[in-house]
Regions:
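Periplasmic c-type cytochrome electron-transfer domains
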Residues: 1-177
């Protein structure tokens, strides 16, 4: 048997430390779920539930985090003007822990989330589900890009989309991408 010296173990980067937090269930009440539980690989599970972080008590779908650094404001109601505040609230209230996270933990999570490039549009070549050119024409004619601006298909402000939330009297929402 030969030994191959590989050198010293490198120090983990902020991104690696953030990934450890993101995938660890030890940061949640009872130790049974993690950020990854609702954002698999940084994406979205597609289920609706109340995350508690935005304080409205209403169910909503956890968003995809790919490219999220570029999509201010954060939360459905735009409550968070910085991603640091959103991540801190998620680590504290959504994960149901008794004390707020350290600034270092928030920075590490941000480094990990910042490494998640925007997802390419989903396209199933076996079942394209319609005419993409016609869809693009409808998108343009309906002026969808007014609220869903390329390249991230969102805008940095809230929009009245004609829906009234009777529980918190909210009329303006953060346009999802």
């Amino acid at each position: 048997t030969r030994k191959l010296p590989l050198g010293p173990t490198p120090e983990p980067t902020k991104r690696h430390l953030g990934a450890r937090i993101f995938f660890s269930s030890m940061r949640s009440l009872g130790g049974w779920y993690s950020c990854h539980s609702c954002h698999p690989e940084g994406g979205s599970r597609g289920h609706t539930f109340d995350t508690h972080a935005d304080g409205d008590g209403l169910a909503k779908k956890a968003p995809d985090l790919h490219g999220v650094l570029h999509t201010a404001p954060w939360a459905w109601n735009g409550k968070f003007r910085t991603l640091e505040a959103q991540v801190g609230a998620s680590l504290h209230t959504t994960m149901a822990v008794n004390e707020p996270p350290s600034p270092e933990d928030v920075d590490n999570i941000l480094a990990f989330i910042g490494s998640l490039e925007p997802s390419p549009p989903y396209y199933d070549s076996r079942n394209p589900g319609g005419d993409p050119l016609r869809g693009a024409a409808i998108f343009e004619k309906a002026d969808c890009s007014r609220c869903h601006k390329p390249p991230y298909y969102t805008v940095p402000n809230l929009k009245d989309v004609g829906v009234f939330d009777e529980y918190d009297e909210n009329r303006e929402f953060n346009p999802p991408s």
